[in-house]
Amino acid sequence: MTISVAIAGATGYAGSEILRLLLSHPAYLSGDLRIGALTGHSNAGQRVSELMPHLPQLADRVIEDTTPEVLAGHDIVFLGLPHGHSADIGRQLGESVTVIDCAADFRLRSKEDWDAFYGGEYAGSWPYGIPEVPGNRDKLKGSNRVAVPGCFPTTITLGALPAVAKGLIEPDLSVIAITGVSGAGKKASVAQLGAETMGNLKAYKPGGTHRHTPEVLQNLQPFTQDSVSVSFTPVLAPLPRGILATITAPLKGDVDKHSVAQAFRDFYAEEPFCLVLPEDQQPETQNVVGTNMVHIQAHVDERTQRLVITAALDNLCKGTAGAAVQCMNLTLGWEETSGLPQAAVAP
């Protein structure tokens, strides 16, 4: 059986990254996966070669308008649409279609959190696409609906989770996360101009106002009886891709660097996309770009008795499109790592 796949919002950064990954997926190369409709409302009628010349295999394909009628009839539909647009289309696609949503519409389990951070109609929640969080993988297997997580929550969750779950820290987290400009999407804005971003660093959405904050809390709270709090400040950097998060929290009990290192290694021992680095190495964005990997390090600050965790990933790959393809593999019962790079391009 050949699986047909459509991508809504194919010309955006998330959509085009999904296409890049699918084009090297073993199922596509063997003919078991077919790339069907490619849609993009503002680019309808244009050829892929005009918009995404880095995808020559699809050069002659024409972008269609994003409508439920165009997307219906496919086995898998990836939604790479702005927040608020996915819920309406998702409702109109039948249960026979597996919908994998890269927006925020179905991530939050709490209506109160949705109202506080997004507003508008609350659409409910779908199985959440970080398979590495215990319990998530089983919910994703065979599911016909998937909510792909935000890029910051993936970085922070996978960085902090071993420490929270193993009781190494008081779960009062302070997070500063540096991100590349592609995280804001392709929509034109003065703040994203090269003249505004090159040679510049800028914090934004400070004071707990960033929309990804409740996702982090939602992910970590089930793994501790203590109340989790997160003070999160994102920082925009002149990078196309990549996130580097620094997470600190007070240590709990008798914890040293050896027990911390062992706890992190044990937690991710069976996870192919989570690499806990040797003590003398630090996560770097250049070492994860283009991959579905998360590189993680944890150090004990003995003077302040705090744990310092650093985590790096590619916001467009493991942070969005790679997670979407990883979840697709799980919903179809395929090998979870299929089509997902672990080796970066260096330098």
Curated annotation (Swiss-Prot):
Its main location: cytoplasm. Pathway: Amino-acid biosynthesis; L-arginine biosynthesis; N(2)-acetyl-L-ornithine from L-glutamate: step 3/4. Keywords: Amino-acid biosynthesis, Arginine biosynthesis, Cytoplasm, NADP, Oxidoreductase. The active site is at C151. It comes from the Bacteria. One of its GO terms (cellular component) is cytoplasm. The keyword Oxidoreductase applies. One of its GO terms (biological process) is L-arginine biosynthetic process. CDD domains: AGPR_1_actinobacAGPR_like, AGPR_1_C. The keyword Cytoplasm applies. This is N-acetyl-gamma-glutamyl-phosphate reductase. It comes from Corynebacterium aurimucosum (strain ATCC 700975 / DSM 44827 / CIP 107346 / CN-1). The gene is argC.
